[in-house]
């Protein structure tokens, strides 16, 4: 299962649908606290995490995950419109496996990359 966390519900839902279309189980939530609750119920193969969110930003969520022994092995890819190099550096220092900037890659390549990071190859051919 790939868990998507984005405060922009349309973005999370669109990515969830694309991943499902590619043959993967995907769930989207709109906040960091909700994501942490979900992580304690079921650990995903990949957490796709936005940076700029109200209440609890993505870096705080990532830091919290890595501080908990039962969650620290969850793979996290940041997916954000934030282009500040310091944000990416901090995310990687905290343990993010990738930092993808929204709008810089097509959805087909994005889905392929997320599936690769999750260790789940796409189940539909590109034909």
What are these regions (language model features)?
Residues 58, 67, 90-98:
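As written
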Residues 37, 59-72:
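Short amphipathic alpha-helix used as the core "switch/output" element in two-component signaling
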Residues 9-27:
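Two-component/phosphorelay signaling modules centered on CheY-like receiver
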Residues 42-48:
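Active-site beta3 strand of CheY-like receiver
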Residues 28-37, 58:
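Helix N-cap/capping motif at the beta->alpha junctions
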Residues 53:
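Receiver (REC) domain active-site loop signature in two-component systems and cognate sites
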Residues 6, 50, 80:
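Active-site residues of response regulator receiver
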